[in-house]
Amino acid sequence: MKKYKFFAALAAAAITFSSCSMDTEPYDQTTTPYTNLKGVETGLNGAYQILAYYPFLGNYAQTMGDFISGVSTGSSSSGHFYSYSSFTFSDTEQEIEDMWNYGYKAISQSTEAINSANSLIASGAISEEEKPTAYLYEGQLYTMKALANWYLVNYFALPYSAANASTPGIIV
């Protein structure tokens, strides 16, 4: 019996001391600029993924208006969006912060890919037959960037009027 306890303690110690390292690089960050059209396509796919992620257009940004207006109601048992349905939310709610962060992540990713596509086209790194595809990707990226800005303005900026014309809307 002592043998089993010894091996169990040894196995537990081995598992404990062989845990994963916290010194990892973020997997969604690029350290080098895009060097070809495939890189721009990868940036485009990344922008789509960020835009459709649940804290932004995958859930929160699309449903927030429904909950705040009373079209939908949050469940008190799950707590999901309940504070918005009952008008007891604050400006520090996690959903609001996530919408802000992922909106700007989508804008940043789109801008990075647009700038890379433009520099590749200007430098001649993209061939003439690839240019229509590059322009197609660029158009999609501009659309995603505009959509993300539109949602951020709708949720976080003041309504435009002559009285607040000098007040900034969102950070551009």
List PLM regions with ranges.
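A structural signal for short, hydrophobic/glycine-enriched beta-strand patches
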Residues: 38, 61-91
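Short, flexible helix-coil linker/hinge segments at the edges of structured domains or between repeats
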Residues: 161-172
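Sec-dependent bacterial lipoprotein signal peptides
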Residues: 1-19
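Membrane-proximal, proline-rich intrinsically disordered regions
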Residues: 4, 20-66
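Conserved, well-structured interaction surfaces
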Residues: 80-156
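Secretory-pathway/luminal and periplasmic proteins that interact with or process carbohydrate-rich
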Residues: 52-57, 73, 148-159
